[in-house]
């Protein structure tokens, strides 16, 4: 008889969180500290969403997410998690860009990026400062239709090399392209330009384990290996409302509010179902474009071997010019090396390299099993060959090679289209409007590009948790007494 992963779970909670990505976990923590009874359900065998890890024979630990985020993570983790977590967030010292148009090393701070643009690229300092000021002034509510590509051309006409330096790291960070609204670049880039790129010392395993411990201290019930099949929808006073979840196997757990940390389209079209929403909202949800996916190659260096320091994040490409299309092509030459040195996990002596490539789900979904295995092997071989340029002879030091594709992302996250970056910009409004269309249901996943990445999803989790808290308190307030005639 299969083990019951819901054994001991109560029949009702104040809030059920579906999914345990950073947005879901943070929302759960905020709500628990506000005094609500919270249940988190995760279908995977460990928590963290895409901020996760896996182990392999030979003592290897591989982190999944590209390990770089803005300094704002320090403040957010201190405020919504613990000082112990925030104190482990440290700067990455060396970000590199190597392609036919440039060979740049930078700390990725505003001052250093300005130095690179002025000294290496010959851009006038006044133009650089004007560009930064424009980005800082951007507002979500301005509804500016300008695209990122159009904005670049306005500030740096004809300078494809400058556009590449600006766009490439953000494309890896959140899947955005030159055709996306300029605000999707501006907000994220400005966040990075504050104080550079940071990472979590200790690895994703240490981070998520500390988060899980904090959640339990605050009374959150955490359960993994539980697949939510659908959101329980009932009719009350002539209107449909979210009333809980139905897990695989049929177990019903009720709740005053359900917060989905799943993909937005999964939440609306699969979990709640089209029939639960007004027709115009379903049309808007279907029109939301899914963002791109990713491939990764995991390279483990044999115990006892070492590799030289080549930088923390190395953005590389053999493509002559920057192209959002080439960046996601099945045969792209554009890849990022995330290099994990022993100080990533203090006390250890191991080196690993995670190679990240942006990708399109449809390119991988159509492959036969034989073609799929062949393409994965090509990814591995080409990634090692590219790494040899920076570390000659590294292939002989590697004793674990493995590749993941958009199909892997889909398998472990159930995301629509295997997306690793949520939705395009229009998804943010659909996500924010969810509780108006189906009371009791909220969404705090990766949406709109600006709510992507570790910092974006944590902050969105806080925003949505505060909405849930406000709604729950409003429910508890007694109805006002009728006014005497």
Question: For the regions a protein language model found, what residue spans apply to each?
Answer:
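Active-site-proximal substrate-binding core of FAD-dependent oxidoreductases
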Residues: 233, 469-485
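N-terminal glycine-rich phosphate/pyrophosphate-binding loop and immediately adjacent elements
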Residues: 2-123
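Helical element adjacent to the flavin cofactor pocket in flavoenzyme catalytic cores
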Residues: 189-242, 246
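C-terminal segments that line or cap access tunnels to active or ligand-binding sites in enzymes
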Residues: 302-404
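A glycine-rich dinucleotide-binding beta-alpha-beta segment and adjacent secondary-structure elements
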Residues: 164-173, 389-451
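Rossmann-like flavin
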Residues: 100-182
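Mid-domain catalytic core of redox enzymes
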Residues: 229-348
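A conserved FAD-binding loop/helix module that cradles the flavin
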Residues: 446-468
């Amino acid at each position: 008889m299969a083990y019951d992963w819901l054994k001991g779970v109560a029949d009702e909670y104040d809030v059920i969180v579906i999914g345990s990505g950073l947005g879901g976990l943070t929302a759960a923590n905020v709500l628990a500290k506000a005094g609500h009874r919270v249940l988190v359900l995760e279908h995977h065998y460990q928590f963290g969403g895409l901020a996760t890890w896996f182990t392999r024979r030979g003592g290897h630990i591989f982190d999944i997410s590209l390990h770089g985020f803005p300094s704002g993570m320090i403040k957010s983790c201190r405020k919504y998690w613990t000082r112990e977590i925030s104190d482990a967030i440290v700067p990455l010292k060396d970000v590199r860009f190597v392609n036919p148009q440039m060979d740049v090393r930078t700390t990725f701070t505003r001052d250093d990026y300005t130095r690179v643009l002025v000294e290496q690229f010959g851009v006038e300092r006044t133009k650089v400062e004007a560009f930064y000021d424009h980005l800082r002034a951007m507002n979500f509510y301005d509804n500016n239709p300008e695209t990122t590509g159009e904005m670049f051309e306005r500030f740096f006409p004809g300078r494809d090399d400058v556009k590449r330096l600006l766009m490439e790291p953000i494309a890896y960070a959140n899947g955005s392209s030159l055709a996306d609204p300029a605000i999707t670049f501006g907000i994220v880039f400005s966040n990075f330009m504050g104080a550079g790129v940071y990472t979590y010392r200790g690895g994703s395993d240490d981070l998520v384990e500390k988060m899980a411990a904090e959640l339990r201290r605050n009374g959150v019930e955490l359960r993994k290996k539980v697949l939510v099949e659908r959101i329980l929808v009932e009719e009350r006073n002539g209107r449909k409302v979210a009333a809980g979840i139905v897990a695989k196997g049929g177990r019903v757990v009720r709740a005053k509010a359900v917060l989905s940390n799943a993909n937005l389209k999964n939440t609306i079209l699969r979990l709640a179902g089209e029939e639960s929403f007004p027709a115009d909202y379903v049309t808007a949800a279907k029109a939301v474009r899914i963002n791109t996916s990713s491939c990764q190659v995991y390279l483990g260096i044999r115990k006892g071997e070492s590799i030289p320091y080549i930088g923390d994040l190395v953005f590389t490409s053999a493509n002559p010019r920057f192209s959002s299309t080439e960046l996601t092509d099945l045969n792209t030459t554009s890849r990022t090396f995330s290099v994990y040195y022993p100080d990533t996990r203090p006390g250890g002596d191991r080196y690993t390299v995670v190679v990240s490539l942006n990708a399109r789900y449809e390119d991988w979904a159509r492959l036969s099993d034989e073609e799929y295995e062949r393409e994965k092997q090509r990814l591995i071989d080409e990634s090692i060959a590219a790494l040899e340029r920076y570390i000659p002879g590294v292939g002989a030091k590697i004793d674990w090679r493995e590749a993941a594709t958009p199909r892997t992302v889909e398998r472990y996250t159930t995301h629509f289209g295997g997306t690793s970056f949520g939705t395009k910009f229009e998804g943010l409004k659909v996500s924010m409007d969810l509780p108006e269309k189906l009371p009791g249901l909220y969404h705090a996943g990766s949406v709109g590009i600006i709510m992507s990445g570790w910092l974006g999803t944590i902050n969105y989790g806080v925003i949505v948790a505060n909405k849930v808290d406000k709604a729950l308190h409003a429910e508890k307030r007694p109805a006002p007494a009728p006014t005497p005639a």
